[in-house]
Amino acid sequence: FIAVLLGGSILYMNSSIRAEQTAEKRRTEFKQLGIDLADASDYLTDEARKFAVTWELLHLNRYWEEINVTQTRDNVISRLQELNSPDEELELLAEAKRNSDALVETERRSMRLIMEALGYPEEDMVYEVATFQLSPEDLELSREEKLEKARDIMFDQEYDDDKDSIMDPIAEFQEIMNARLEAELEVARKATT
């Protein structure tokens, strides 16, 4: 009888340890996904701002490669859905993604202003930049005014506020997610003691 009881205890303990390890692994992955989303947003901002200042096509190309090829923001949200993240957490990241998509419009405008000022024909522009329609006011600006406007809109208070509208939901996601996963981990830890 004691051998059966001891065997059952060992199986229960092993199962509890695995549950704790799984909870810790989930917490680590969720945390990394939140970091990845914030980093992707920062990367896009950095590349768009570098292009606005240096006019180097390398930065423009890196920006659009992240959006169209690497797609970190979309991949993070897809992975969180696969992990059955709670709706509240997914909605926060969806809000951050929507706000990020809206900021892309400001960045496209800046890029288009630069490409226009530098005399690039539309067929030599990245599709997303070529298809951005500048306002009549933007079109009337001189070369120098276009370059200045392109820089200004990438560094003004409105841009910073828009950037905060991306990072704030990500920070809230991380707080809620950390609390939830810490609670899951604590339950798993208690099962091993």
What are these regions (language model features)?
Residues 57-153, 157, 162, 172:
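Heptad-repeat alpha-helical coiled-coil/4-helix-bundle sensor or tether segments in soluble regions
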Residues 2-43, 83-99, 191-192:
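Amphipathic alpha-helical segments and their boundaries
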Residues 26-52, 70-74, 93, 100-103, ...:
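N-terminal alpha-helical signal peptides/signal-anchor transmembrane segments
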Residues 2-18, 41-74:
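Short secondary-structure boundary segments
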Residues 11-24, 45, 114, 135-193:
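Juxtamembrane amphipathic/coiled-coil helical coupling segments that flank
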